[in-house]
């Protein structure tokens, strides 16, 4: 598996973590994905996407929410997830490139709720809970 560049980012509610799978130059867009409430970024669909696009012109960034970095087992309220997600996405985006956000399950919900706030041009929702 390709090894990501890992960066810690301070948020209002603790340190989140970016796992950046570098794209080839010139990069065309950034895809930022979050994990679900019951698991981490090692979910099979998230790792498959990161591996499939590694070295392409699409940079993939998997985000670990602060509660996961802290080792907690239960996700906080959606408002707190959103408050942590927004600065993490801004840090993940870096350059002024088209941004696609998404995630697995609860991560997809966070991405949908905050897509306008972060300036996303699209959303990729995996295992989206109804």
Q: What is each residue range found by the language model?
A:
Residues 9-99:
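Serine-hydrolase catalytic machinery in alpha/beta-hydrolase-like enzymes
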Residues 85-130:
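Primarily recognizes the serine-hydrolase "nucleophile elbow" in alpha/beta-hydrolase
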Residues 4, 51, 109:
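Residue-level detector of functional hotspots within protein domains
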Residues 1-8:
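Short, hydrophobic/aromatic-rich segments at coil-to-beta transitions
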């Amino acid at each position: 598996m390709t090894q990501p560049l890992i960066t810690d980012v301070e948020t209002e509610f603790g340190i989140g973590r970016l796992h950046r799978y570098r794209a080839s130059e010139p990069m065309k867009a950034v895809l930022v994905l979050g994990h679900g409430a019951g698991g981490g970024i090692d979910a099979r669909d998230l790792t498959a996407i990161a591996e499939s696009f590694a070295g392409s012109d699409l940079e993939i960034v998997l985000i670990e929410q602060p509660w996961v970095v802290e080792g907690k087992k239960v996700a906080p309220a959606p408002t707190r997830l959103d408050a942590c997600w927004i600065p993490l996405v801004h840090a993940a985006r870096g350059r002024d490139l088209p941004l696609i956000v998404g995630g697995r399950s609860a991560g997809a919900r966070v991405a949908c709720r905050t897509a306008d706030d972060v300036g996303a041009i699209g959303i990729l929702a995996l295992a989206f809970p109804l």
